[in-house]
Regions:
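N-terminal accessory regions of nucleic-acid-interacting proteins
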Residues: 1-28, 32-35
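Short linear clamp-binding motif
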Residues: 3, 239-246, 270-286
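Short secondary-structure capping/turn segments at boundaries of alpha-helices and beta-strands
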Residues: 12-13, 40-43
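Metal-dependent phosphoesterase core characteristic of DEDDh/y 3'-5' exonuclease domains
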Residues: 16, 21-22, 36, 45-83, ...
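Flexible, glycine- and charge-enriched loops at secondary-structure boundaries
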Residues: 44, 88, 92, 191
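Metal-dependent phosphoesterase signature
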Residues: 80-102
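N-terminal intrinsically disordered, compositionally biased regulatory/targeting segments
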Residues: 229, 261, 266, 283-286
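Acidic, proline-/serine-/threonine-rich low-complexity intrinsically disordered repeat tracts
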Residues: 245-273
Length: 286
């Protein structure tokens, strides 16, 4: 146990703690999920589009449908979130206008929180590069969404909610509906509306804090882990994101997907951070 603490101390330091009013909750609905192997920085033109973006900060709530820019919303994703191409054209606001307002609030907030934050932040980053350009990205996105501010309720609740293998290891990434049902038995909410999702998430977080599963605190990472390098990367296989965890999980692609059962490995002593460990840390954009 002490070895794990030492390693984590080297990875980041927990900074000042905050209250719920200091958290910017956000969620987006999209035209789909990225094809396997695509990277938001190198392959942003091939990423799906954002269909709806909602967020809250303190008493403020915002929700916008995005006006399509020469693309169609596939029927299979409309079946999930209910937003058609026709509705988005009639009611939508250009992505650049919406994301500018969101990033102003996210930048002002000490913490940002989402369920599967890697997916939502990657979708936003890719679409910022597509519609706003790299100069805008550099000026606005890194500070607003940097990993030291992030809270990911999906990754934090895998063991709390997820179905388990026979050996006790986590079997899947929990959907927000599953987390909500676990915390509030018998209750539901209208999932896959971005605004309703953040309302549900905002209700879950205080319960998770009380259970000791998450804390409302910033983390300080080495500077080299916080900036995107915008260099194409070769696709890599599953990567362990919990160092020296007896029940490791692999990096998510989408909410609710099964986690491949890892091959048991012998106990290994803790080692100081080396170049390979730093490389793994740098790849995991959480």
């Amino acid at each position: 146990m002490r070895a794990k603490t030492v390693i984590n101390d080297l990875i980041f330091k927990v900074m000042q703690k905050f209250d719920l009013k200091d958290v910017c909750f956000f969620d987006c609905e999209t035209t789909g999920v990225p094809a396997k192997g695509l990277k938001w920085d190198a392959d942003f033109k091939q990423f799906p589009h954002v269909v709806q973006l909602a967020w809250s900060l303190g008493d403020k709530e915002k929700s916008y449908i995005i006006k399509p820019d020469n693309y169609e919303i596939p029927p299979e994703t409309t079946a999930i979130h209910g937003i058609t191409t026709e509705r988005a054209i009639a009611e939508g606001v250009p992505f650049a206008e919406v994301v500018d307002e969101f990033l102003a609030d996210a930048n002002a907030a000490p913490l940002v929180c989402a369920h599967n934050i890697y997916f939502d932040s990657s979708m936003l980053k890719a679409n910022v590069l597509r519609y706003c350009g790299r100069e805008y990205y550099d000026a606005h996105v890194e500070d607003a969404l940097h990993k030291g501010k992030r809270i990911d309720t999906m990754m934090k609740t895998i063991k709390f909610v997820g179905a388990l293998y026979s050996n006790g290891r986590p079997g899947k990434y929990p959907k927000l509906e599953e987390l909500y049902s676990k915390l509030f038995p018998g209750e539901t909410f209208p999932a896959h509306d971005a605004l309703e999702d953040i309302r549900a998430l905002r209700r879950c977080v205080p319960e998770l804090v009380n259970l000791g599963i998450i804390e409302l605190a910033q983390k300080e990472y080495p500077a080299e882990q916080l900036k995107a390098q915008f260099e194409p990367e070769k696709p890599k296989g599953g990567r362990n994101i919990e160092f020296h965890d007896p029940n490791p999980v692999t990096e998510p692609i989408g909410t609710g997907e099964p986690v491949p059962e890892p091959t048991p490995e012998p106990e290994r002593p803790a080692v100081p951070l080396n170049s390979k460990t730093r490389e793994l840390l740098n790849e995991n954009d959480f």
